[in-house]
Amino acid sequence: MEVRTRFAPSPTGHLHIGGARTALFNYLFAKRYGGKFILRIEDTDLERSSIESEKVIIESLRWLGIEWDEGVEVGGPYGPYRSTERVDIYKKYVDVLFEKGYAYYCYCTEEELEAQRQELLSKGQMPRYLGKCRNLTEDQKRRFEQEGRKPTVRFKVPEGVKIVVHDLVRGDVEFLSDDIGDFVIVKSDGIPTYNFAVVIDDHLMKISHVIRGEEHLSNTPRQILIYNALGFELPQFAHVSLILGKDRTKMSKRHGSTWVEQYRDQGYLKEGLINFLALLGWSPPEDREIFDMEYLIENFSLERVSKNPAIFDIDKLNYINSQHIKLKSLDELTQMCIPYFVEAGYIKEDEAKSKFEWLKKIVKSVYEGLDYLSQIKDRVDIFFNNEVKIEEDEAKEVLKWDHVKDLINVFENKIRQMNELTPEAIKLLFKEIQKETGYKGKNLFMPIRVALTGKTHGPELVEIIEIVGKENILKRLEFFKTWYN
């Protein structure tokens, strides 16, 4: 049997972190076993679905490196791959259910259904449809239609049946049909519901494994009933755990960004995010945390997927991403940082090429401390601003030292005499100043650092002086002396 998995998002918003994790697990499982991964768009929610959302989801998947073998935009033998383009296909199978006695028209209004729901709740019972329209006569149906009622189609759930979901992550999970009640499979506008469409699509697209979030587990018995009624073979189900925040509540905006493109725009690398997403519920067969897509494809299995909730830990994501930043070549990293230099107004877009080597030196001096690339905007302002503001309390304390003025004058005079500021020449310069003034270590370097950057911490002072260059160093010292005096 060929392994065929799918990711079937509703285009009603952005690609959520949970959705991205589901897509990744499906992709990895298919690739691990030489199968096919399919992307299907479930746009049956006409009010909330949009082409814009679909584009955002597709862009996010492609950015992550999750490519599909069949589906929207790439085609395939079992299309179309949007639910709204498959309505005629669904209608055929609704007719089959009517013929077999598994479907009926329901004319209940929203108000009637809500009243029934409240009555069951008041009795401490689980809300479900009690089958009021199950056995309507043709006359009753006609009367309802004359009143202007538009019917839904409901699935007739057999009574007293135990439904077992054989789950590859959770083991066997049992449900009772009496707790489910007859459920809607076609809405009053003629569009099928998710629970019906997903069965038809998964069957016709020959999906072998349905890997999805735990929140879909309660839908599965309904889907199994439809599979059985139509005589379809069941796929294998695997329901992966929920993603919770560190406080063990459902992940939401208060736990940080929840959409993939928010992380992309902040400058998280796709390699870092993929690595982190894989660890939300799956554990590698060896003791390691940093790996690439190739490793994941070779090692992913559902046996190593936990049924316990996955905890979204932003500190762990930052650590993993920082390790992937360090794995990039300096050229690659610089190229990736250019949009943030432009965004901060440090350079114009058309200057990036001519200033590339200089920008590379800047990136080299700060990249080791980065968790994500947009942080670079705040780390590199010291290279672009000659009018240095001294606002840190720690920096102001340094300026109270008695020898600051004399030391800065000596430093300025030495810089003026230098032809080029290479790392070797700058190190030699500091040795000369130390010999001449007697100051060394913190007493030598800290006042110069504060005068040039306004800060007490940052990249190596030698790197700062080389990158800023003689002309700008002198401008900074002039500005500093005016401010200091």
From Swiss-Prot:
This is Glutamate--tRNA ligase 1. It is found in: Cytoplasm. The keyword Heme does not apply. CDD domains: GluRS_core. GO terms for biological process: glutamyl-tRNA aminoacylation. The lineage of its organism: Bacteria, Bacillati, Bacillota, Bacillota incertae sedis, Caldicellulosiruptorales. InterPro entries: aa-tRNA-synth_I_cd-bd, aa-tRNA-synth_I_codon-bd_sub2, aa-tRNA-synth_I_CS, aa_tRNA-synth_I_cd-bd_sf, Glu-tRNA-ligase_bac/mito, Glu-tRNA-synth_I_codon-bd_sub1, Glu/Gln-tRNA-synth, Glu/Gln-tRNA-synth_Ib_cat-dom. Catalyzes the attachment of glutamate to tRNA(Glu) in a two-step reaction: glutamate is first activated by ATP to form Glu-AMP and then transferred to the acceptor end of tRNA(Glu). ATP binds at residue 253. PROSITE patterns: AA_TRNA_LIGASE_I. Pfam families: Anticodon_2, tRNA-synt_1c. Its EC number is 6.1.1.17. Its main location: cytoplasm.
